[in-house]
């Protein structure tokens, strides 16, 4: 099964309870400050369906020009991320355009212990290695700089007050968010398993269709690796219609 604009619209209209629970879970995390080096914004993080929905809603509420730009950047990210580290599509300058609805991965970055963060990094490297082999089996060798890229551990995040947060608290919050999202039943599983917890994949599939997005990604990535030319992708992105018109 795949998502359609109709299903996303239905979820946006009927998910107020789950989104309130998500807000309450986020509110239990301490407020933080950092030096705004935007290292945590190097990539769009994985997320659950319940985390993706507030951002889709926020996009729909934005002024037309900004909404169009961010959707273009997010869909462009889906096609470009195997060949280039472009930063999160919601980062502009040093500002996050969806900051109030930023994902758990953004909120927890810099709060994990260094040991736990390294464990997450090991898992991420294994996943990237598997992805590299999948592309290689299709005749595409991904750039080493992309495959080897790892968001560095950050020592610059501090809580605003005396509260100390530990891995156990963060894991509890993560589990709670997963449980809230699981309330969407099979749709939660679709997003995790078929869309790989990737908002950029979801928006691309809503725009072009699921199978067409996968085929387009293979063709565009193959061509960009072989030619180092992204003009075909740029043309596609520039001509995108307003996706949110079908979701609101």
PLM regions: where:
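Short loop/turn segments that flank or connect secondary-structure elements
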Residues: 1-39, 46-95, 99-248
């Amino acid at each position: 099964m795949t998502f359609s604009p109709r299903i996303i619209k239905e979820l946006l209209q009927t998910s107020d309870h789950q989104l309130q629970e998500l807000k309450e879970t986020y509110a239990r995390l301490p407020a933080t400050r950092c030096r705004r080096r935007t290292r945590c914004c190097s990539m769009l993080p994985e997320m659950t369906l319940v985390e993706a929905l507030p951002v889709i809603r926020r996009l729909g509420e934005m002024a037309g020009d900004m909404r169009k730009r961010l959707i273009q950047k997010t869909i462009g990210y889906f096609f470009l991320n195997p060949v280039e580290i472009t930063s999160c599509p919601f980062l502009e300058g040093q500002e996050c355009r969806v900051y109030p609805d930023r994902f758990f991965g953004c909120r927890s970055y810099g709060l994990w212990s260094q040991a736990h963060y390294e464990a997450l990094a090991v898992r991420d490297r294994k996943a990237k290695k598997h992805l590299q082999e999948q592309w290689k089996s299709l005749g595409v060798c991904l750039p080493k700089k992309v495959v080897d890229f790892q968001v560095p551990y950050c020592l610059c995040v501090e809580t605003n007050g005396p509260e100390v947060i530990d891995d156990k608290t963060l894991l509890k919050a993560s589990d709670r968010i997963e449980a809230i999202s699981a309330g969407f039943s099979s749709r939660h599983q679709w997003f995790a398993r078929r869309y790989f917890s990737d908002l950029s994949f979801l928006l691309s599939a809503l725009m072009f269709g699921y199978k067409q997005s996968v085929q387009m990604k293979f063709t565009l990535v193959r061509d960009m690796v072989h030619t180092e030319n992204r003009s075909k992708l740029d043309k596609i992105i520039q001509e995108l219609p307003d996706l949110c018109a079908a979701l609101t």
